[in-house]
Regions:
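Core dinuclear metal-dependent hydrolase active-site scaffold
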Residues: 1-55, 134-197, 324-329, 335, ...
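Pre-active-site segment of Zn-dependent metallo-hydrolases
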Residues: 12-17, 24-83, 87-137, 188-199, ...
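Gly/Ser/Thr-rich loops at beta-strand to alpha-helix junctions
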Residues: 13, 66-68, 164-165, 249-256, ...
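Active-site neighborhood of phospho(di)ester-bond hydrolases with catalytic His/Asp-centered motifs
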Residues: 31-33, 57-66, 73, 85-88, ...
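Acidic/glycine-enriched edge-of-secondary-structure segments
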Residues: 33-37, 58, 179-185, 189-191, ...
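Cap/insert and terminal regions of metallo-dependent hydrolase folds
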Residues: 94, 169, 191-278, 362-367, ...
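Metallo-beta-lactamase
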Residues: 102-164, 293-332
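Hard-cation-handling environments
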Residues: 230-371, 445
């Protein structure tokens, strides 16, 4: 067999920045091209320069549209990449919106800090809107369960990862001078979540497995428990006239929250207070969701019996900046859902700046908060937090709900591995903080995988 090499250029020893370089069948294939997030100076250092010549990459396989998996694709194009980017149709449509938004946020944040005289190297935009738009010209939509030849001896199959709309596990088969099967899990979702279908793992013998580990050392509450706690949070904030501030990923999490609040409102389980989705990106993403009902979970009764999942009387979509600003001076209780999910950018920063000092308010986290992010600092209970160039005293209540996580927990990851069925020759564990990486490695060994590695950044392996 010709040489097979795998190099880990992101999400190795940490959660963000997913990017893995596969050299096979005479081609150089990039599995994801994600942005590092968190500690700004360190992330900027890792993001600003690609560790290879972009012009020598033949193709990209994109597992899903989250920025920590797709956010460096415009930089790749900026640096000279012009090959195909393979993704599911829903991922293609989501990334069109999300990458343009990422470019806009970088440019606007830089302009804001420039006006304030607080420009730092890490605030320089990585790429422009033009670069983000150029990515879409290279996108090739590949439906689930349709084998597609990336090269003559390299076949690709996408299976539903159940993580977000369009997310996929990648099944790659190299047939040059022999056979080698590589499976990249992407981000594995949970069973029983609304809207998207349950994860569908590839089955049969696997030579090389690359698997995520985000929550391999944790156990989530159920979705029903999460909805109950969400209802309690809404009622508690309403009773004291405060605001429920929810940093939420614009794709997936925002729509799941709308789904839950719709169900709770219809069932009379929450007070009739206004709910604002204050994120132009999330509004656009919701439009993309409406475009792809073919990937919804038709086993979910509320989906089947509801004509319009994403519209109900309490819900208001906010696009206009002036309307967003007006929410901060609005009297009375309200729910405000805004991106970004880790409170690193977007309108949630301005809502936190105005609301984190008010004891009536509640900051509710419904997703993973990576190390060094503002979300992690608030979630961990810091009484003083610095963002937008100023220090803020936290008086607002803080709570976290894990049941909305789009990542499989310990037991769900173990079940996913078991459902693979066939023997696994070797496995690489990525996309986790050190305790989770080690927990996932232990799960794999317990399930009979003898060769388990936890690669470090830049580490390369002959397969």
């Amino acid at each position: 067999m010709s040489s097979l090499r795998l190099t880990f250029w992101g999400a190795a020893g940490q959660v963000t920045g997913s990017m893995h370089l596969l050299e096979a069948a005479g081609a150089r294939i990039l599995l994801d091209g994600g942005l590092f997030q968190g500690h700004r100076a360190e992330s900027h250092r890792l993001n600003v320069q690609l560790p290879f010549d972009a012009r020598r990459i033949d193709a990209v396989v994109l597992s899903h549209a989250h920025i920590d998996h797709s956010g460096r694709l415009p930089l790749l194009v900026k640096e000279g990449f012009h090959g195909p980017i393979y993704a599911t149709p829903a991922t293609r449509d989501l990334s069109a919106v999300m990458l343009a938004d990422a470019a806009n946020i970088q440019e606007k944040d830089h302009e804001y800090l420039e006006r304030k005289g607080r420009v730092a190297p890490e605030s320089e935009p990585l790429y422009s809107l033009r670069d983000a738009i150029a990515v879409q010209d290279l996108m090739v939509g590949v439906p689930y369960r349709r084998v597609f030849h990336v090269r003559k001896h390299l076949a690709l199959d996408f299976l539903d990862a159940g993580h977000i709309l369009g997310s996929a596990s990648v099944d790659l088969r190299v047939s040059e001078n022999g056979n080698h099967r590589l499976v990249y899990s992407g981000d594995i979702g949970r069973s029983g979540l609304p809207i998207v279908r349950d994860p569908e793992p590839p089955t049969g013998p696997i030579d090389t497995l690359i698997v995520e580990s985000t929550y391999a050392n944790r156990q989530h509450e159920s979705f029903d428990q999460a909805e109950t706690r969400l209802a309690e949070a809404v009622r508690r904030v309403a009773s004291r006239g405060g605001k429920l501030l929810i940093p939420a990923f614009a794709v997936g999490r925002a729509q799941e929250l709308i789904y839950s609040l719709h169900r709770l409102s219809r069932a009379g389980q929450i007070p009739q207070i206004p709910i604002y989705l204050d994120s132009p990106l999330a509004v656009d993403i919701t439009t993309v969701f409406r475009m792809h009902p073919e990937v919804f979970d038709r086993a979910e009764r509320f989906i089947v019996t509801t004509n319009e999942l994403f519209d109900f009387p309490l819900l208001h979509y906010v696009r206009d900046v002036s309307e967003s600003k007006a929410l901060n001076s609005r009297n009375g209780p309200a729910v405000i859902i805004a991106a970004s999910g880790m409170a690193e950018s977007g309108r949630i920063l301005h809502h936190l700046a105005h609301g984190i000092g008010d004891h009536r308010n509640l900051v509710l986290f419904v997703g993973f908060q990576a190390e060094h992010t503002l979300g992690r600092r608030i979630e961990s209970g810091q009484e003083r937090v610095r963002f937008l160039g100023q220090e803020h005293e936290r008086r607002a209540e803080v709570e976290s709900i894990t049941g909305y996580s789009a990542h499989a927990d310990r037991d769900e990851l173990r079940a996913w591995v078991r459902r693979l069925g066939g023997p696994i020759r070797r496995a690489f564990v990525v996309h986790g903080e050190p305790p989770a990486l080690e927990a996932m490695a232990a799960i794999l060994r317990e399930e009979g995988v003898r060769d388990v590695r936890v690669p470090s950044h830049g580490e390369s392996f002959e397969l």
